């Protein structure tokens, strides 16, 4: 395995501090991994420009790579194109559902810009019912909303698409 492949593999173990069931790879925020003069360069895009977890993510990336013998890690942030939930891996979406968080639906399915946008039903991650109600636009983090399933009665987070 070459060094860049090794780095990608190491990044699989770096958890998102706000949704620890996901790695930074699952989340889809790692855009590029390269070596410049033998030193790792990681290019990432935050889930949104004011994401409070970015400093902790950078620290976790550096620590993980340092533990595997990589030093002088450069981490570059790229804001364009902006991250979308479509960049999240299918494995990551499955992990969210297993953890009890409804994964984001594809952008074209649920996120309609404009004045007359219609809210789509979000399936319950526990019983798969679409008979759900949004309780709050904002959950424990800015990227989640709180829903309740009207069939099983359970509240759940929905990872909002953007």
Show which residues each predicted segment covers:
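Domain-level signature for proteins that mediate thiol-based redox and metal-cofactor handling
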Residues: 1-162
């Amino acid at each position: 395995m070459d060094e860049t492949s090794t780095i990608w593999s190491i990044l699989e173990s770096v958890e998102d501090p706000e949704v620890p069931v996901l790695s930074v790879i699952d989340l889809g925020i790692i855009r590029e991994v390269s070596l410049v003069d033998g030193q790792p360069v990681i290019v990432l895009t935050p889930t949104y420009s004011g994401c409070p977890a970015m400093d902790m993510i950078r620290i976790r990336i550096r620590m993980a790579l340092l533990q595997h013998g990589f030093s002088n890690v450069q981490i570059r942030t790229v804001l364009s194109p902006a991250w979308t939930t479509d960049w999240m891996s299918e494995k990551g979406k499955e992990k969210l559902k297993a953890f009890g968080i409804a994964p984001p639906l594809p952008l074209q399915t649920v996120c309609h810009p404009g004045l007359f946008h219609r809210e789509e039903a979000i399936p319950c991650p526990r019983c798969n019912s679409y008979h759900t109600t949004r309780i709050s636009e904002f959950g424990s983090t800015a990227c989640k909303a709180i829903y309740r399933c009207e069939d099983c009665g359970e509240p759940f987070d929905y990872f909002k698409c953007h």
